Design a protein with these regions (language model features):
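Glycine/Thr-rich phosphate-binding loops that ligate phosphate moieties of nucleotide
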Residues: 1-226
Length: 226
């Protein structure tokens, strides 16, 4: 349910394996929402989407999004649950609610992986992320820190920069890993919002309960077909 890989810090005298949580539907959900909101004239940017989400309170007024619409999920033991939107009310919910619920659904799905890592004894205290993708959003960073109950440290890097540094390290352009990454700058540190910790625990628990029910129904239907 998690991926193990040879880490860039691996050495013959100091073995290092990395572990990776992968949720196929996270990034594509947010890009799907962006495409959805750009069906009519007038472009909606990710910055505008993030601003809309910031205006909505925790829990998106009851709206729930499940970002599992991009094929089977290893985290869910290879199940193809499909994406869904739950508790949608046409009178209460608008685009901002959908964006906020999408953010929360992405974070909740990643937190499933964090729960799994915890069972393997992996310490979950601090997260380091690049200033890119969804971590560009202060709202996303705050929700992520609160739901996972971790300190989130944002550095001035992204996937392309990291890949280039790793390749240069492998080509022995740098003397060691410390030299390869010493120029990275910490640009933000986000702590869990303690005022929302209990609320988000309840929201995550409710979200997970619906997911567990969907998985149970999926498994039951599969068994009936055998």
């Amino acid at each position: 349910r998690i991926n193990t890989f040879l880490h860039v810090n691996d050495r013959s005298i100091s073995k290092r394996n990395g572990i990776l949580i992968c949720v196929n539907g996270t990034g594509i959900l947010y890009s799907w929402l962006k495409r959805l909101f750009n069906q009519t004239p007038g472009s909606v940017s990710y910055e505008q989407m993030n601003a809309h989400a910031q205006q909505i309170s925790a829990g998106a007024d009851g709206l729930q999004v499940y970002p599992f619409g991009n094929g089977s999920e290893r985290l869910l033991e290879g199940r193809h649950v499909q994406a869904s939107i739950e508790q949608l009310d046409f009178n209460r919910h608008h685009a901002g609610h959908l964006i906020r619920a999408g953010m929360e659904g992405i974070i909740f799905s990643l937190n499933l992986g964090f729960d799994l890592l915890g069972t393997y004894g992996v310490p979950l205290q601090s997260i380091r992320a690049g200033h890119s993708n969804m971590f560009l959003s202060p709202t996303f960073r705050s929700i992520f820190a609160t739901v996972t109950n971790t300190e989130v440290r944002i550095f001035d890097t992204d996937g392309a920069d990291g890949a280039a540094r790793g390749a240069a390290l492998g080509a022995e352009f740098y003397d060691d890993a410390s030299q390869a990454f010493e120029s990275l700058k910490l640009i933000d540190t986000v702590e869990p919002d303690r005022a929302l910790t209990n609320q988000y625990f309840d929201l995550y628990s409710g979200w997970k309960e619906v997911l567990d029910t969907a998985i149970h129904e999926l498994d039951r239907n599969h068994t009936n077909l055998l």
